[in-house]
From Swiss-Prot:
It comes from the Eukaryota. The keyword Chaperone applies. SUPFAM superfamilies: PDZ domain-like (SSF50156). Interacts with PSMC3. Part of a transient complex (modulator) containing PSMD9, PSMC6 and PSMC3 formed during the assembly of the 26S proteasome. This is 26S proteasome non-ATPase regulatory subunit 9. It comes from Mus musculus. PANTHER family: 26S PROTEASOME NON-ATPASE REGULATORY SUBUNIT 9 (PTHR12651:SF1). GO terms for biological process: negative regulation of insulin secretion; positive regulation of DNA-templated transcription; positive regulation of insulin secretion; proteasome regulatory particle assembly. One of its GO terms (molecular function) is bHLH transcription factor binding. The modification Phosphoserine is found at residue 128. GO terms for cellular component: nucleus; proteasome regulatory particle, base subcomplex. Acts as a chaperone during the assembly of the 26S proteasome, specifically of the base subcomplex of the PA700/19S regulatory complex (RC). During the base subcomplex assembly is part of an intermediate PSMD9:PSMC6:PSMC3 module, also known as modulator trimer complex; PSMD9 is released during the further base assembly process. Residues 108-194 form the PDZ domain. Belongs to the proteasome subunit p27 family.
Length: 222
């Protein structure tokens, strides 16, 4: 996960928390409206259970005397207004839930993509070999020399030269000593070339040129 993802994650978490808080506020308001609707229905129930549609006049067309007409009309009006408010509020709740689910789905997709990327990076890291540290570098090779025949190349970094390695290397004289004692004998040489490790077989031999190798080796500054 990159550093840029951290503020993005924090921003997403804050946005989700705000969305959840908004939904909770809407749900509280919904419960309040439903309680108010019930209270007004209770008023109608107290008036002979008159309900929302029963007539407020008697069979002769006169206002009913057995109920409080003002309370009934007020309760009916309140119920209609509150039901409209409830309907609009439920639409807000539905939209808020839809947005929250969409945000969660987007976050889930982003988390899955990040998890896949992290897993891929771990696989790449585990598959990438850890290259040993080199102690010297080849800076010149003569054509036709034992070093050239063995496959050494300019800029090869030497990790192991016979018995000389990073742990016991002190100076190029160590390499010279091994070469002098190995004339005509094969030496295992390990080099790093363009990020890859190569194993070579070098035989120090007298040839037309100078020395037994025909190459120049310089120590690496660490």
């Amino acid at each position: 996960m990159s550093g840029e993802d951290v503020p993005h994650r924090a921003e997403s978490s804050e946005a989700r928390a705000a969305a959840v808080s908004d939904i909770q506020d809407l749900m509280r308001r919904k419960e309040e409206i439903e309680a108010e609707i019930k209270a007004n229905y209770d008023v109608l129930e107290s008036q002979k259970g008159i309900g929302m549609n029963e007539p407020l006049v008697d069979c002769e067309g006169y206002p009913r005397a057995d109920v409080d007409l003002y309370q009934v009309r007020t309760a009916r009006h309140n119920i209609i207004c509150l039901q409209n408010d409830h309907k609009a509020l439920m639409k807000q709740v539905e939209e808020a839930l839809h947005q929250l689910h969409a945000r969660d789905k987007e976050k889930q997709a982003r988390d899955m993509a990040e998890a896949r990327e992290e897993a891929m990076n771990r696989r790449l890291a585990s598959n990438s070999p850890v290259l040993p540290q080199a102690f010297a570098r080849v800076n010149s090779i003569s054509p036709g020399s034992p070093a050239s025949i063995a496959g050494l190349q300019v800029d090869d970094e030497i990790v192991e030269f016979g018995s000389v390695n990073t742990q016991n290397f002190q100076s190029v004289q160590n390499v010279g000593t091994v070469v002098q004692h190995s004339e005509g004998k094969p030496l295992n040489v390990t080099v790093i070339r363009r990020g890859e490790k190569h194993q070579l077989r070098l035989i120090p031999t007298r040839w037309a040129g100078k020395g037994l190798l025909g190459c120049n080796i310089i120590p690496l500054q660490r």
